[in-house]
Regions:
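Residue-level detector of short, conserved catalytic/binding motifs and their immediate flanks
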Residues: 50, 75, 122
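Conserved catalytic core of two-metal-ion nucleotidyltransferases
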Residues: 38-42, 60, 92-156, 163-184
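Long, well-ordered hydrophobic secondary-structure segments characteristic of membrane-embedded
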Residues: 78-82
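Non-catalytic N-terminal regions of enzymes
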Residues: 71-73, 77, 110-115
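Generic detector of well-ordered alpha-helical segments enriched in charged/polar residues
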Residues: 7-14, 25-28, 32-35, 95, ...
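N-terminal regions immediately upstream of nucleotidyltransferase
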Residues: 1-72, 83-93
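Long, charge-rich alpha-helical interaction segments
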Residues: 165-211
């Protein structure tokens, strides 16, 4: 009885905090729209094959509902220019180049709130009714360098193929042409997270079966 009460409480809490499906759909429409813009005729970045995808809690499915209507969902996303390398541009140049496209997208979509710049990203604030903003991190592939690093440390390389390098204006080499950029791997982390969740699910299923 006690266990059932706890499970009922946790289920009620989950439903209270859970993000509605239409919010996920809204976020997906937003970064799909941005991806289409970056691939349009006349885009200054289309030749680099930009890929837009979400990261963080929205990718993991762990986002929680804001406490009040005044608070917003933070949709973290990445724009990975898959045919661009760190040998061609600095972090600063990449961020400026993508920023120009994001400003143009903002104007073309008649968005009212101005584009903001974060340390690692550009930020698009959507209309008040949408109740979310999108952080857009510029990135380039980093799978080879990341694989070699993990391999040299005898660490798991299963998810190295999706590693990226990102921009951060706080870095001392932000305006220098160098291979030393901040590293990230949101796709790899999501895959690792899913694998851990699968293990937890299997354990719970086994316990439920035994009981």
């Amino acid at each position: 009885m006690h266990v059932n009460s706890i499970e009922a409480f946790l289920d009620a809490l989950r439903q209270e905090l859970e993000v509605p499906d239409h919010r996920y759909e809204q976020a997906e429409r937003s970064y799909t729209s941005l991806a289409n813009w970056l691939h349009r005729d006349g885009s200054t970045v289309s030749r680099y094959d930009p890929q837009v995808y979400c990261q963080g809690s929205f990718r993991l499915g762990t986002a929680i509902r804001p406490h009040t209507e005044a608070e917003e969902y933070d949709v973290d996303s990445v724009v990975e220019l898959r045919l661009l390398t760190k040998r061609e541009k600095t972090q600063y140049q990449l961020k400026l180049m993508l920023g120009a496209e994001i400003h143009a997208y903002h104007d073309a979509m008649d968005m009212l709130k101005p584009v903001r710049e974060g340390n690692r990203c550009w930020i698009l604030d959507y209309a008040d009714g949408a109740q979310f903003h999108m952080d857009i991190v510029p990135a380039v592939p980093n799978h080879n360098q990341h694989y070699m690093l993990l391999n040299s440390l005898s660490l798991d390389t299963r998810w190295a193929s999706t590693a990226i390098s990102i921009t951060d204006r706080r870095e001392p080499n932000y305006k220098l042409l160098t291979d030393t950029w901040p590293r990230s791997n949101p796709k790899g982390y999501a895959s690792w997270f899913a694998s851990r969740q699968a293990i937890v699910f299997e354990r719970r299923l086994l316990i439920a079966t035994e009981n």
